Design a protein with these regions (language model features):
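Mid-domain catalytic core of redox enzymes
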Residues: 1-116
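Conserved flavin/dinucleotide-binding core of flavoenzymes
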Residues: 72-166
Length: 166
C-alpha cells in the first residue's frame, strides 16, 4: 500500500534496477551506479526432450550450447542429471532461451525472468557498489555484484552481512 513504514535498516536483496525503483529518495550515487545496470529477459524451460542435446550421447555435458549459423541467437541446455548429480532414470534438462522447438508433452514447466547484462561500464561500476553500503542505513546485495549467477547473489549477501556487522 501507500503507508509509511519506519525501519532502522533496509536490505535490498534484489536486482539493481528494482532496488533503485524501491528507493523513495535515492542518492545521486545510487542513481548513477544502480541506474547503469540493465537486464535482459530470459525464458527457462524444464523438460525431458533429448532433442536439445548433442546427437552423440558421448558429447553430452552439463552445459550444452546450441546456436544458429549467424550466431545471433544462442541457447544453453543444462543436463540436470549430470549437473546436479540426480539419481533417476529419466533425463532432465533446463534450456535457456530455446531456439528450437521443445516437444510440448516433454515440457514440465516454463518461467520468465531477467538476468543482468554486463558491459565495460557496469564491470567498472561493480567496484563502486560497495561504496553504497550502509549509506542512509540502506544495504544492497544481488547477483549484479558478481557475474549474474544465483551464487553471486548469495556471495554478495554474505559480504554485505560482514560489512553490516562492522
Amino acid at each position: 500500500g501507500n503507508e509509511y513504514l519506519d525501519y532502522d535498516y533496509v536490505v535490498l536483496a534484489s536486482h539493481a534496477d528494482q532496488s533503485l525503483r524501491i528507493l523513495d529518495q535515492p542518492t545521486s550515487d545510487e542513481k548513477r551506479i544502480l541506474g547503469e545496470f540493465k537486464y535482459v529477459a530470459n525464458t527457462a524451460i524444464l523438460h525431458t526432450d533429448e532433442n536439445l542435446m548433442p546427437k552423440n550421447k558421448l558429447a553430452w555435458s552439463s552445459w550444452n550450447s546450441i546456436s544458429k549459423e549467424d550466431l545471433s541467437k544462442t541457447c544453453v541446455t543444462y543436463w540436470l542429471n549430470n549437473l546436479q548429480n540426480l539419481k533417476c532414470e529419466e533425463n532432465y534438462f533446463l534450456t535457456l532461451n530455446p531456439i528450437q522447438k521443445i516437444e510440448t508433452d516433454k515440457i514440465i514447466t516454463s518461467v520468465n525472468f531477467t538476468h543482468p547484462y554486463f558491459n565495460l561500464r557496469t564491470a567498472k561500476l561493480q567496484n563502486e557498489l560497495f561504496s553504497l553500503q550502509g549509506k542512509k542505513r540502506t544495504w544492497f546485495c544481488g547477483s549484479y555484484f558478481g557475474y549474474g549467477f544465483h551464487e553471486d547473489g548469495l556471495k554478495s549477501s554474505i559480504e554485505m552481512i560482514k560489512d553490516f556487522k562492522k
